Amino acid sequence: MSKPTREEAKEAVRTLLKFIGEDPSREGLLQTPDRVINSYVEIFSGYGKDVAEILNTKFYETCNFRDFILLNIKFTSFCEHHILPFNGTVDIAYVPDNCIVGISKLARIVNIFARRLQIQEKMTVQIAESVQENLKPLGVAVKISAVHSCMSMRGVMQDNSVMNTMHYTGIFAEQQKYRHEFLNLTAKR
C-alpha cells in the first residue's frame, strides 16, 4: 500500500466535511484540512519509532533491588475501530535481572504505542512484551485504565465506564504473590 500525498489526505478531509453536511470552502473550514493533517502527523507519530532504540541505554550497576514500579503514566490514544480518542493511565512494574532503564524511557514507550491507532488490549501487551524483550527482566506487569470516547460519545453513551487491561510476563504470570502485590499498589491511587 502506497502512502497518499499530503494533498490527497487534505482532499480526503474535505470529502469527510462534505459527507457530514459541511461546506469545506466556508471561511471557518478553509484551513481545517491542513490542521487535521498536521494534528494527525503529531497524534500518530508512534509509527516508525523503534522501542529498542529507546531502551538502548541501560544501567547495570544499580540492579541491587527487587522491584521497579512506575505508576500513573498518562496517555491519549485513538481506537482503531472508530478513530476516537481513549485516554487513561499506564502502570508498569518489572523485576530486574541485571539492568534497569531511566524512568522516562518507560513513559516514552507508552507514547510510542499510544501514538498509533490502537485497541487497549493490544497496547497493554505491546508495552509489556517490549519491556520483556528489551530488558529481559524476571517479569513484567502492565495495567492500563482508560475511558473510551467510542463508548461515551456514541453507541451506549457511557461516560463513566473505565476499562482495565493487564498483561503479565515471567514471575508476574507465574506467581500470584507478584500479581497481587502489583494490583494492590495500582489500586491504592
From Swiss-Prot:
Pfam families: GTP_cyclohydroI. Disulfide bonds: none annotated. GO terms for cellular component: cytoplasm. It comes from the Bacteria. It catalyses: GTP + H2O = 7,8-dihydroneopterin 3'-triphosphate + formate + H(+). The keyword Nucleotide-binding applies. Toroid-shaped homodecamer, composed of two pentamers of five dimers. PANTHER family: GTP CYCLOHYDROLASE 1, GTP CYCLOHYDROLASE I. HAMAP family: FolE. This is GTP cyclohydrolase 1. It comes from Rickettsia conorii (strain ATCC VR-613 / Malish 7). The lineage of its organism: Bacteria, Pseudomonadati, Pseudomonadota, Alphaproteobacteria, Rickettsiales.
